[in-house]
Amino acid sequence: MDTPKLTVVALTTREARIWDAGIDPHSRSVVVEAPGHRRNVHVRAAQEEQLHHRRIDDPAFYDKVIGGLPLTGDILLIGHGRGKANAMLSFVQHAERTRPDVAARVVGAIDNDLTSMTEGQILASARLWLSHHSLMR
């Protein structure tokens, strides 16, 4: 029996990393940056970015993420944040309102501190979730 295709989306308020070609340790992600977000190298610019937070529920950003997803297959979300800062929850709510077909494909969500994780660790977390989820079926 073939396993369904799983797309992993690691989502923060600033970017989404999408793995749609598998979750093996050497898979590469596609990065979707939030509109208006730029990486600053000057210390003052970096301070400005930290002090002035952007909207969590940015529809233009979420539409870009949805546009970067494959048309079929299951979706596993990985994110962090609590309450109003939870981009993963805001993304699902946006998808439910605008693209219920995409929202229906979300099969799971993992709450991890993405700021301290490498891409390999994110994929390892997805593999662990998949192995546990497969055992539950």
Residue ranges: model-predicted function:
Residues 1-137:
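Terminal alpha-helical anchor/extension segments at protein ends
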